[in-house]
């Protein structure tokens, strides 16, 4: 691992810590969960997971996740992705402004 990689990991850890300590992680996470619920995404992913488990005759978490995750991610609406990304960007801008 290069010094630049280590520095990037340290910066990421600091940002994550600040995100949690400031309460922004919980706010953003709750907002995302509510949006996904309102849009029916959670029900869609549950159905997709159930179908995958039945079709593949497996309950192995890693295998099911590998099959379901790409489609589940693609099912998130552009509006939800944009809204959450804007909240994350605003959080990062606040961090940069305070340093």
UniProtKB/Swiss-Prot annotation:
One Gene Ontology term, aspect cellular component: transcription export complex 2
GO MF term set: chromatin binding; enzyme activator activity; transcription coactivator activity
Subcellular location(s) of the protein: Nucleus, Nucleoplasm; Cytoplasm, P-body
GO terms for biological process, alphabetical: chromatin organization; nuclear mRNA surveillance; poly(A)+ mRNA export from nucleus; positive regulation of transcription by RNA polymerase II; post-transcriptional tethering of RNA polymerase II gene DNA at nuclear periphery; protein transport; regulation of protein localization; regulation of transcription by RNA polymerase II
Main localization, broad class: nucleus
Pfam families per UniProt: EnY2 (PF10163)
Domain of life assignment: Eukaryota
Keywords: Activator, Chromatin regulator, Cytoplasm, mRNA transport, Nucleus, Protein transport, Transcription, Transcription regulation, Translocation, Transport
Oligomer and partners: Component of the nuclear pore complex (NPC)-associated TREX-2 complex (transcription and export complex 2), composed of at least SUS1, SAC3, THP1, SEM1, and CDC31. TREX-2 contains 2 SUS1 chains. The TREX-2 complex interacts with the nucleoporin NUP1. Component of the 1.8 MDa SAGA transcription coactivator-HAT complex. SAGA is built of 5 distinct domains with specialized functions. Within the SAGA complex, SUS1, SGF11, SGF73 and UBP8 form an additional subcomplex of SAGA called the DUB module (deubiquitination module). Interacts directly with THP1, SAC3, SGF11, and with the RNA polymerase II.
Family indicated by similarity: Belongs to the ENY2 family.
Function: Involved in mRNA export coupled transcription activation by association with both the TREX-2 and the SAGA complexes. At the promoters, SAGA is required for recruitment of the basal transcription machinery. It influences RNA polymerase II transcriptional activity through different activities such as TBP interaction and promoter selectivity, interaction with transcription activators, and chromatin modification through histone acetylation and deubiquitination.
PANTHER family the UniProt entry points to: ENHANCER OF YELLOW 2 TRANSCRIPTION FACTOR (PTHR12514)
Protein name: Transcription and mRNA export factor SUS1
Source organism of the structure: Eremothecium gossypii (strain ATCC 10895 / CBS 109.51 / FGSC 9923 / NRRL Y-1056)
